[in-house]
């Protein structure tokens, strides 16, 4: 598995478990408590969960080319914007430590993707 694939798999797994699944499955009251956002229905949270899941599918499409030695520029650019933007917004607007932890995670993913763009040959090397 390449370093880039490892980064993408980590992003998919952690975000899927800690962000997408809760948005799709947790009760509205729990999501409102965690996010400090109140809505008339759970639809807002569910739609956001679907949007995050769609991004995770996009990340998954970057793994096969990376394993074949081709750099998935579109996936990496998408991930840099998504994770970098998310990290900045969470840092600026965060009101609790859970948001800061997510900001750090997204920021590290963005930095990893930027490093991959700077050194694509290194990102495609096998991690083991």
What are these regions (language model features)?
Residues 1, 36-37, 65-68:
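Helix-boundary and loop/linker segments of multi-pass membrane transporters
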Residues 87-105, 121-123:
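Membrane-helix boundary connector in multi-pass membrane proteins
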Residues 3-16, 40, 101-116:
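Alpha-helical transmembrane segments of integral membrane proteins, especially early/N-terminal helices
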Residues 16-22, 41-64, 77-88:
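Core segments of alpha-helical transmembrane spans in multipass integral membrane proteins
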Residues 117-128:
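Juxtamembrane boundary at the C-terminal end of a transmembrane helix
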Residues 35-42, 70-75, 98-108:
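Non-cytosolic membrane-interface motifs at loop->transmembrane helix junctions
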Residues 3-8, 18-43:
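Membrane-helix boundary elements
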Residues 59-72, 91-96:
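Juxtamembrane helix-break-helix junctions at the cytosolic face
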């Amino acid at each position: 598995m390449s370093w880039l694939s490892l980064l993408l798999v980590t992003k998919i797994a952690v975000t899927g478990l800690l962000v997408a699944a809760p948005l799709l499955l947790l009760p509205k009251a729990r999501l409102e408590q965690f996010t400090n956002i109140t809505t008339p229905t759970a639809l807002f949270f569910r739609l956001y969960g679907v949007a995050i899941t769609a991004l995770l599918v996009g990340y998954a499409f970057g793994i096969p080319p990376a394993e074949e030695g081709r750099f998935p520029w579109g996936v990496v650019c998408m991930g840099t914007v998504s994770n970098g933007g998310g990290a900045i917004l969470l840092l600026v607007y965060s009101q609790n430590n859970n948001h800061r932890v997510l900001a750090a995670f997204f920021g590290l993913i963005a930095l990893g993707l930027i490093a991959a763009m700077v050194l694509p040959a290194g990102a495609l090397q096998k991690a083991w």
